[in-house]
């Protein structure tokens, strides 16, 4: 279970980064994934190279992908309304309405204190949750917020896999790879059916191990 590993990420230095330039979001590419692909316990055949970065993370720049009819520059489309998806004393999750009723765009806001909130953007697709690690310096408390998000994915969404994605040319890529590998995430091989074709992005996956009694 991911709970037993959460403390590892709480001490990670990857959540205190230097400021980076703006980069295009990866999430629009996730929306283009086929919803018919089975996701249950899929092997990822991950790469084991945790040096400067996997060879498949090419340095060739790629143009940003856009949601058809959308802005594609990390700004929310104002024509999309949002509905409350889930709420408790730590999380408030809203869902952006899309034309695809099998893919959900979730805006997750964690409440660390009454005055401090941290937001994450995720896509729920075919029992998998995709979370983009944003560029730039993350605010203080992001490590605790991410831990709460993982618990939400396991206990409330009951997904099979959690994917994280981040741009391969960020300065802290090697640190991110080490941190999430230690947490239990695996590097996803290129061309895997559960991730979009984005050679400019790195994807890692965590598979939840459930008892047979929980799956019945």
UniProtKB/Swiss-Prot annotation:
Q: Which GO terms describe its cellular component?
A: cytoplasm; nucleus
Q: Which InterPro entries does the UniProt record give? A: Acyl_CoA_acyltransferase, ODC_AZ, ODC_AZ_sf
Which molecular function terms from Gene Ontology are attached?
Answer: ornithine decarboxylase inhibitor activity
Q: Name one GO biological process term.
A: viral translational frameshifting
Q: What domain of life is recorded for the organism?
A: Eukaryota
Entry's SUPFAM superfamilies?
Acyl-CoA N-acyltransferases (Nat)
Pfam families cross-referenced by the UniProt entry: ODC_AZ
Q: Indicate the quaternary assembly.
A: Interacts with ODC1 and thereby sterically blocks ODC homodimerization.
Q: Which family does it belong to?
A: Belongs to the ODC antizyme family.
Summary of the function given for this chain in its UniProt record:
Ornithine decarboxylase (ODC) antizyme protein that negatively regulates ODC activity and intracellular polyamine biosynthesis and uptake in response to increased intracellular polyamine levels. Binds to ODC monomers, inhibiting the assembly of the functional ODC homodimer, and targets the monomers for ubiquitin-independent proteolytic destruction by the 26S proteasome.
Q: What is this protein called?
A: Ornithine decarboxylase antizyme 1
Q: Which gene encodes it?
A: OAZ
């Amino acid at each position: 279970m991911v709970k037993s590993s959460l403390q590892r990420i709480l001490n990670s230095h990857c959540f205190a980064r230097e400021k980076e330039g703006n980069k295009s979001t990866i999430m629009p590419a996730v929306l283009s994934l086929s919803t018919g692909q089975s996701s249950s316990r899929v092997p990822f055949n991950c790469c084991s190279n945790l040096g400067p970065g996997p060879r498949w993370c090419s340095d060739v720049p790629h143009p940003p992908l856009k949601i058809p009819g959308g802005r594609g520059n990390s700004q929310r489309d104002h024509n999309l309304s949002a509905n409350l998806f889930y709420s408790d004393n730590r999380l408030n999750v809203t869902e952006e309405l899309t034309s695809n009723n099998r893919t959900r765009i979730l805006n997750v806001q964690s409440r660390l204190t009454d005055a401090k909130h941290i937001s994450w953007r995720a896509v729920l697709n075919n029992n998998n949750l995709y979370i983009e690690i944003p560029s730039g310096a993350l605010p203080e408390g992001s490590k605790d917020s991410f831990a709460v998000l993982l618990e939400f994915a396991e206990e409330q969404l009951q997904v099979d896999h959690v994917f994280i994605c981040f741009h391969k040319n960020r300065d802290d890529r090697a640190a991110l790879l080490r941190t999430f590998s230690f947490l239990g995430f695996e590097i996803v091989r290129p061309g895997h059916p559960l991730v979009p074709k984005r050679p400019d992005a790195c994807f890692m996956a965590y598979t939840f191990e459930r008892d047979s009694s929980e799956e019945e």
